[in-house]
C-alpha cells in the first residue's frame, strides 16, 4: 500500500511523519488497497475492480474500479473524492454503509472530455 502526503519533500520528512504512527494499512491485496489516517479519520482507497471493503462498522462498495478519499464530516455526512484513473468515462456507483445508516451516490464521468477520470467531489448524506 502507499499513501500520498502533501508537503513531504524528502525521505527524512516521510520517516518523521510515519513515526507519529497515525497511518494504518487496512488492506493491501490485488483487489483493494486501503489506508487510514487515524488522527484525521481520512481514508484513501484504491479499488482495482468492482468490490467492497469492510472495516469494523463501515462498508464501502463500488461497482467499478476507482480511487476514493473519504472523510467523515459528522454522523450523517461524508465527503467523497472519487477519480477514475482508468478513464473509462462511465458512471461509478459508490455505496457506504454505517451503523443504521447508508448512502449511495452515482458519479458520472461520461462527459469528462480531455479531463477523463479527473477527481470529483460529492457530499453523501447517510440516512
Language model: regions and residue ranges:
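Terminal accessory/anchoring regions of large secretory-pathway or extracellular enzymes
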Residues: 1-127
